[in-house]
Amino acid sequence: MAFGVSIPEENYDALVQYVDEAYKDFDCTPIYSVDLIWDGTKDLSSKAFAEIADEEKIWGKGVEDPLIAIEGFRIYGKQLRLFGLEKGKPTLNIQLDDGSSLVKFKSSEEEYELLHSDLGYVIINAVGTCTRSNWGIPQFMITDYEIIGRNEYYF
């Protein structure tokens, strides 16, 4: 069922004030029910991503891909790449030392700037799933993330 509502234009500001007041204590923070929590300072690796991604044959028919949280992951500037802008499909790629990566589709230059640091690192918590790329490389597909800190070095 669908319906519509209209209000006189002169009442618009009053409605906005009313809604703002009514929902001022409402927490809009996303909440995820995850299957596993990894320590972003030590648990991330191609092997860990592969172990979960390679179980893809059991997902489906009521069994969803496991949703994984990564806590306290540091992104250094040299790890972060943004590509696909010219094709209209901006994608962030965070390369790990072992060749695997964390990937976020539907990104932007603004998001890249938020996560990039030339003089230190940005710390995030993220949620997502493990997959393999088209080339068979294990990767972590970021569903959502939050920036929890940053460290800039000044000399």
Residue ranges and their predicted role:
Residues 1-155:
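Acidic, two-metal ion nucleic-acid-processing modules in DNA metabolism proteins
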